[in-house]
Amino acid sequence: GVHVEDRGYQFADAVYEVIAVVKGRMVDEELHLKRLDRSLREIRMEMPFTAGIFRLKVAELLRLNRVVNGSLYLQVSRGVSPRNHQIPSAISPSVVMTVRPMIPPSAEMFGRGVAVITVRDIRWRRPDIKSVSLLPNVLAKDDAVRNDVFEAWQVDDGVVTEGTSTNAWIVSNGTLITPPPADAILNGIT
Protein backbone atom coordinates (compact mmCIF):
# COMPACT_ATOMS: atom_id res chain seq x y z
CA GLY A 1 0.00 0.00 0.00
CA VAL A 2 0.85 3.67 -0.06
CA HIS A 3 2.22 5.09 3.19
CA VAL A 4 0.02 7.83 4.66
CA GLU A 5 3.07 10.14 4.80
CA ASP A 6 4.10 9.56 1.20
CA ARG A 7 4.59 12.98 -0.37
CA GLY A 8 2.77 11.87 -3.51
CA TYR A 9 -0.30 11.20 -1.37
CA GLN A 10 0.09 14.25 0.90
CA PHE A 11 1.22 16.90 -1.60
CA ALA A 12 0.89 15.38 -5.11
CA ASP A 13 4.71 15.57 -5.01
CA ALA A 14 5.02 12.96 -7.73
CA VAL A 15 5.06 12.46 -11.48
CA TYR A 16 3.81 9.64 -13.66
CA GLU A 17 3.77 8.08 -17.12
CA VAL A 18 1.29 5.81 -18.86
CA ILE A 19 2.84 3.56 -21.49
CA ALA A 20 0.92 1.45 -23.98
CA VAL A 21 1.89 -2.22 -24.14
CA VAL A 22 1.34 -4.06 -27.44
CA LYS A 23 2.24 -7.73 -27.88
CA GLY A 24 4.12 -7.64 -24.58
CA ARG A 25 6.30 -4.68 -25.53
CA MET A 26 6.17 -1.08 -24.37
CA VAL A 27 5.36 1.40 -27.13
CA ASP A 28 7.78 4.34 -27.36
CA GLU A 29 9.46 3.27 -24.11
CA GLU A 30 12.52 5.49 -24.57
CA LEU A 31 10.41 8.59 -25.26
CA HIS A 32 8.30 7.94 -22.16
CA LEU A 33 11.38 7.43 -19.99
CA LYS A 34 12.89 10.62 -21.40
CA ARG A 35 9.71 12.55 -20.56
CA LEU A 36 9.63 10.97 -17.08
CA ASP A 37 13.26 11.98 -16.53
CA ARG A 38 12.46 15.54 -17.64
CA SER A 39 9.46 15.74 -15.29
CA LEU A 40 11.58 14.40 -12.43
CA ARG A 41 14.36 16.92 -13.08
CA GLU A 42 11.80 19.76 -13.19
CA ILE A 43 10.65 18.81 -9.66
CA ARG A 44 14.27 18.42 -8.48
CA MET A 45 14.41 14.63 -8.45
CA GLU A 46 16.56 12.05 -10.20
CA MET A 47 15.50 8.93 -12.07
CA PRO A 48 15.29 6.20 -9.38
CA PHE A 49 16.22 3.32 -11.70
CA THR A 50 18.16 2.47 -14.83
CA ALA A 51 16.40 1.65 -18.08
CA GLY A 52 17.60 -1.95 -17.73
CA ILE A 53 16.13 -2.41 -14.24
CA PHE A 54 12.91 -0.76 -15.42
CA ARG A 55 12.58 -3.20 -18.35
CA LEU A 56 13.14 -6.19 -16.05
CA LYS A 57 10.49 -5.01 -13.57
CA VAL A 58 7.99 -4.29 -16.35
CA ALA A 59 8.56 -7.73 -17.92
CA GLU A 60 7.94 -9.35 -14.53
CA LEU A 61 4.82 -7.25 -13.94
CA LEU A 62 3.40 -8.10 -17.37
CA ARG A 63 4.13 -11.81 -16.86
CA LEU A 64 2.62 -11.96 -13.36
CA ASN A 65 -0.53 -10.14 -14.49
CA ARG A 66 -0.74 -11.98 -17.83
CA VAL A 67 -1.04 -8.72 -19.76
CA VAL A 68 -0.02 -8.79 -23.42
CA ASN A 69 -1.90 -5.72 -24.68
CA GLY A 70 -2.56 -3.06 -22.11
CA SER A 71 -1.25 -0.02 -20.34
CA LEU A 72 1.48 0.42 -17.79
CA TYR A 73 1.05 3.11 -15.13
CA LEU A 74 4.29 4.25 -13.51
CA GLN A 75 4.37 6.77 -10.64
CA VAL A 76 7.42 8.15 -8.88
CA SER A 77 6.87 10.15 -5.70
CA ARG A 78 9.51 11.93 -3.67
CA GLY A 79 8.96 9.33 -0.93
CA VAL A 80 7.90 9.08 2.70
CA SER A 81 8.69 11.79 5.25
CA PRO A 82 6.87 13.67 8.01
CA ARG A 83 4.40 16.17 6.56
CA ASN A 84 6.24 19.40 5.81
CA HIS A 85 6.07 21.59 2.71
CA GLN A 86 9.86 21.85 2.56
CA ILE A 87 11.51 19.25 0.33
CA PRO A 88 13.42 16.86 2.63
CA SER A 89 17.16 16.60 1.99
CA ALA A 90 17.53 12.83 2.49
CA ILE A 91 14.63 10.76 1.21
CA SER A 92 14.17 7.72 -1.02
CA PRO A 93 11.61 7.93 -3.81
CA SER A 94 8.59 5.64 -3.93
CA VAL A 95 7.90 3.86 -7.22
CA VAL A 96 4.53 2.30 -8.05
CA MET A 97 3.81 0.39 -11.26
CA THR A 98 0.55 -1.23 -12.31
CA VAL A 99 -0.62 -2.82 -15.55
CA ARG A 100 -4.07 -3.46 -16.91
CA PRO A 101 -5.49 -4.86 -20.12
CA MET A 102 -6.34 -2.23 -22.69
CA ILE A 103 -9.74 -2.01 -24.33
CA PRO A 104 -9.06 -0.75 -27.86
CA PRO A 105 -11.17 2.06 -29.31
CA SER A 106 -14.07 0.89 -31.45
CA ALA A 107 -14.00 1.04 -35.24
CA GLU A 108 -16.73 3.69 -35.02
CA MET A 109 -14.52 5.89 -32.83
CA PHE A 110 -11.73 5.62 -35.39
CA GLY A 111 -14.08 6.23 -38.30
CA ARG A 112 -16.28 9.01 -36.96
CA GLY A 113 -14.24 10.48 -34.14
CA VAL A 114 -15.71 11.38 -30.77
CA ALA A 115 -17.77 14.21 -29.31
CA VAL A 116 -16.07 16.57 -26.87
CA ILE A 117 -16.92 19.60 -24.79
CA THR A 118 -14.56 22.43 -23.99
CA VAL A 119 -13.76 23.61 -20.49
CA ARG A 120 -11.56 26.36 -19.13
CA ASP A 121 -8.06 25.04 -18.43
CA ILE A 122 -7.73 25.60 -14.67
CA ARG A 123 -4.61 23.49 -14.15
CA TRP A 124 -1.41 24.90 -12.71
CA ARG A 125 0.95 26.76 -15.03
CA ARG A 126 3.31 23.80 -15.60
CA PRO A 127 1.31 21.22 -17.55
CA ASP A 128 4.58 20.23 -19.26
CA ILE A 129 5.37 18.35 -16.02
CA LYS A 130 3.38 15.13 -15.89
CA SER A 131 2.26 15.70 -12.29
CA VAL A 132 -0.12 13.40 -10.42
CA SER A 133 -2.08 16.50 -9.39
CA LEU A 134 -5.04 15.79 -11.70
CA LEU A 135 -8.05 17.21 -9.85
CA PRO A 136 -8.86 19.72 -12.65
CA ASN A 137 -8.74 16.85 -15.17
CA VAL A 138 -11.02 14.71 -12.98
CA LEU A 139 -13.59 17.50 -12.70
CA ALA A 140 -13.46 18.23 -16.44
CA LYS A 141 -13.85 14.53 -17.32
CA ASP A 142 -16.86 14.41 -14.99
CA ASP A 143 -18.32 17.38 -16.92
CA ALA A 144 -17.84 15.40 -20.14
CA VAL A 145 -19.57 12.32 -18.73
CA ARG A 146 -22.44 14.45 -17.40
CA ASN A 147 -22.80 15.90 -20.92
CA ASP A 148 -22.76 12.41 -22.48
CA VAL A 149 -19.61 13.03 -24.53
CA PHE A 150 -16.29 11.19 -24.69
CA GLU A 151 -13.87 13.88 -23.55
CA ALA A 152 -13.40 17.44 -22.31
CA TRP A 153 -10.82 19.57 -24.07
CA GLN A 154 -9.16 22.16 -21.89
CA VAL A 155 -8.92 25.66 -23.35
CA ASP A 156 -6.53 28.38 -22.17
CA ASP A 157 -7.01 31.89 -23.56
CA GLY A 158 -8.82 30.54 -26.63
CA VAL A 159 -6.24 27.82 -27.33
CA VAL A 160 -7.02 24.11 -26.96
CA THR A 161 -4.26 22.70 -24.77
CA GLU A 162 -5.22 19.02 -24.34
CA GLY A 163 -7.94 16.64 -23.23
CA THR A 164 -8.37 15.44 -19.68
CA SER A 165 -6.67 12.14 -20.50
CA THR A 166 -6.03 12.48 -24.23
CA ASN A 167 -4.15 14.57 -26.74
CA ALA A 168 -6.29 16.92 -28.83
CA TRP A 169 -6.39 15.92 -32.51
CA ILE A 170 -8.70 17.15 -35.26
CA VAL A 171 -8.74 15.88 -38.84
CA SER A 172 -10.23 18.50 -41.15
CA ASN A 173 -10.26 18.06 -44.93
CA GLY A 174 -7.54 15.43 -44.62
CA THR A 175 -5.28 17.66 -42.51
CA LEU A 176 -4.25 16.72 -38.97
CA ILE A 177 -4.53 19.64 -36.53
CA THR A 178 -3.07 19.51 -33.02
CA PRO A 179 -1.54 22.09 -30.68
CA PRO A 180 2.16 22.71 -31.43
CA PRO A 181 4.74 21.49 -28.89
CA ALA A 182 5.14 24.05 -26.11
CA ASP A 183 5.67 24.39 -22.37
CA ALA A 184 1.97 25.27 -22.07
CA ILE A 185 0.99 21.68 -22.89
CA LEU A 186 2.16 18.18 -22.11
CA ASN A 187 3.54 16.98 -25.42
CA GLY A 188 2.02 13.65 -26.41
CA ILE A 189 4.02 10.55 -27.26
CA THR A 190 1.81 7.59 -28.13
Residue ranges and their predicted role:
Residues 1-60, 82-190:
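Helix-start/capping segments and mature chain N-termini
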Residues 20, 64, 75:
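Active-site microenvironments in enzyme catalytic cores
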Residues 58, 67-76:
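Ordered, amphipathic secondary-structure segments that act as subunit-interaction surfaces
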Residues 65-69, 147-148:
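A structural signal for short coil/turn segments at secondary-structure junctions
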